[in-house]
UniProtKB/Swiss-Prot annotation:
Mitochondrial matrix side: 17-36
Organism: Saccharomyces cerevisiae (strain YJM789) (Baker's yeast)
Spans through the membrane: 37-56
Transit peptide: 1-16
Family: Belongs to the MICOS complex subunit Mic60 family.
Record protein name field: MICOS complex subunit MIC60
Location in the cell: Mitochondrion inner membrane
Recorded topology in the membrane: Single-pass membrane protein
Chain segments annotated as coiled-coil in the UniProt record: 172-267
Keywords: Coiled coil, Membrane, Mitochondrion, Mitochondrion inner membrane, Transit peptide, Transmembrane, Transmembrane helix
GO BP terms: cristae formation
Function description: Component of the MICOS complex, a large protein complex of the mitochondrial inner membrane that plays crucial roles in the maintenance of crista junctions, inner membrane architecture, and formation of contact sites to the outer membrane. Plays a role in keeping cristae membranes connected to the inner boundary membrane. Also promotes protein import via the mitochondrial intermembrane space assembly (MIA) pathway.
GO CC terms of this entry: MICOS complex
PANTHER family the UniProt entry points to: MICOS COMPLEX SUBUNIT MIC60, MITOFILIN
Length: 539
């Protein structure tokens, strides 16, 4: 249809041209600026990248510069090196054939454009360029081939989107080239798959063969090492067993030898004992004869010597007891003088207590009674049935438990009262009572359940109170009690002062708790020291 219309236009133009109208018709020149510019840029870029890739393979410095500064140069170099280093060369040949066909196609397009430029006056039938994409199954194909097919499809889509109008002959040629390229790429894809499959089969067989060889070698080596280790272990076990049996045999021989030696020694010892007994019997008979003769008064002398030693022991005990009593009296007097000395603000009597405990324990040993009821110890009795063969007497009397003495009880109480604590003097106790004057006045104004406001109010109003001094009365108000306690402390009547303070109740009693504790400690120490002094004087 298009060809018939074009032929009619040509005939019409020729008919009109044969008519001499006196005017000349200028034929318009066919202009394809966009298409020519596109193909020029594409060919220039292809030549630039191809030359850069080729020269980069020869010069490493240029290759680094080219890949770092030119866009897409690094990806193209990696693609080229990938296909260049493959074990087979079928991809390179296929790519060269495809590139040659593309060059022919481009040259055909260029030649056709030049022909159209030379035939300015000829009018041809044109068609819009529309190429079909390359529909090739690339599911299991090479990744680089997938990229090439994708790039060609992008190029075909860009050509289709440009809506280029080309002559029918060129359109048919381009379409045929597209079909040939599709066929070649399909063949290339199949060839790649087949080559890859063959390569994998070959490589798999080589790996299996290599693994079998390694397995056989390792198996032989393992058997050899296992046999060697087993032989070595058997030799070691044999050697250890031999050593163990030799050692056991040696130990048994040594034990038998020691048993025989011990048996021989026992027999010799038994013989020696028998001989010693016979010898002792002979000696005893001779001594009895001598005793009945020249040593008849030896027993009397021995009894007199024993009586003398007993007298000396009794005298020594009496002297030691008297010395212990003297030292106890001295220590008690020392404690008395220290706790009654007003020049010392506080006194610590731990050292004196330790000496008193030591002397008390020593004195208790002297006062220890005999274990028998008659006053004599079993060891002093002669001809006792408990006397053994060697002359030792085992006392079978029941031990008597003596109750603790008053001295030890008083010392224990004194130690529990004063251990690690200081005893204040009378003057120090009086001074501390005077220091409680302000707090005592404040406490006398406080109600039973006072809060913070009550405390502050009592503190303020206590400033207006006066402390009562002088001859106290028998009244029970706080001022009279304070005055009586101060007067008793001034005359060293600590007992009455403590009774007055203890009788207080409420806040005044709570304020004086620490003072009561110190005063009671002083009174208890004084009473215990007096008890010790009386007990020592009665011993």
């Amino acid at each position: 249809m298009l060809r018939t219309t074009a032929s009619r236009k040509i005939v019409l133009r020729r008919g009109l041209a044969s008519i001499n109208t006196g005017t000349t018709v200028a034929s318009k020149k066919a202009s394809h600026k966009f298409r020519n510019t596109f193909w020029t840029i594409a060919l220039s870029a292809t030549a630039f990248y191809a030359g850069g890739i080729i020269y980069s393979q020869k010069n490493d410095k240029f290759g680094d510069f080219f890949s770092n500064n030119v866009p897409f140069a690094e990806d193209l170099l990696e693609t080229y090196e990938h296909y260049h280093d493959r074990p087979t060369l079928f991809l390179e040949d296929s790519w060269d054939g495809l590139k040659a066909k593309s060059n022919d196609l481009l040259s055909g397009l260029t030649g056709s454009s030049q022909t159209r430029r030379s035939n300015r006056e000829n009018i041809e039938v044109k068609k819009i360029l529309s190429l079909e994409p390359l529909n090739i199954e690339t599911e299991n194909s090479d990744p680089q081939l997938k990229e090439i097919i994708g790039s060609l499809n992008d190029l075909i889509n860009s050509l289709n989107d440009s809506n280029l109008s080309i002559p029918e002959s060129e359109f048919n040629s381009i379409k045929k080239s597209n079909q040939n390229m599709l066929t070649n790429l399909s063949q290339l894809n199949e060839t790649l798959k087949e080559a890859l499959s063959n390569y994998m089969i070959q490589r798999t067989s080589e790996v299996i063969t290599e693994l079998n060889t390694q397995y056989e070698n390792s198996k032989r080596e393992f058997e050899k090492n296992l046999q060697k280790n087993l032989l070595q272990e058997v030799d070691e076990f044999k050697e250890n067993l031999t050593k163990q049996k030799d050692k056991e045999l040696e130990e048994k021989l040594k034990a038998n030898e020691e048993l025989l030696q011990a048996k021989h020694a026992n027999e010799v010892g038994l013989l020696s004992i028998t001989q010693v007994k016979e010898f002792n019997k002979i000696i005893k008979d001779k001594i009895e004869k001598e005793r009945n003769g020249r040593l008849a008064h030896l027993e009397e002398i021995n009894s007199e010597v024993n009586d003398l030693s007993k007298s000396i022991d009794r005298s020594s005990k009496i002297l030691s007891k008297n010395e212990a009593l003297v030292q106890l009296t001295f220590q008690v007097d020392e404690i008395k003088s220290r706790i009654n000395n007003n020049n010392l603000p506080d006194v610590n009597i731990d050292k004196e207590l330790s000496r008193l405990k030591l002397l008390s324990n020593l004195l208790s040993t002297f006062n220890k009674k005999s274990c028998c009821d008659d006053g004599d110890c079993c060891s002093c009795k002669k001809g006792n049935k408990n006397e053994g063969k060697e002359g030792k007497i085992s006392c079978k009397c029941k031990p008597k438990t003596n109750p603790p003495s008053l001295l030890s009880v008083a010392l224990d109480e004194l130690e529990s009262t004063c251990s690690g604590k200081k005893i204040l003097s009378n003057e120090q106790i009086y001074n501390r009572w005077n220091l409680l004057a302000d707090d005592f006045k404040t406490a006398s104004l406080l109600p039973p359940n006072s809060g913070i406001l009550g405390q502050l109010t009592a503190k303020v109003f206590s400033l207006f109170l006066f402390t009562k001094t002088g001859n106290p009365s028998n009244a029970t108000d706080f001022d009279s009690v304070y005055a009586r306690v101060g007067d008793n402390l001034r005359v060293s009547n600590l007992n009455d002062a403590v009774e007055e303070v203890v009788s207080l109740k409420g806040w005044p009693h709570k304020v004086c708790e620490s003072w009561i504790e110190d005063a009671r400690r002083k009174l208890e120490v004084q009473r215990l020291v007096e008890i010790l002094d009386c007990e020592i004087r009665t011993l």
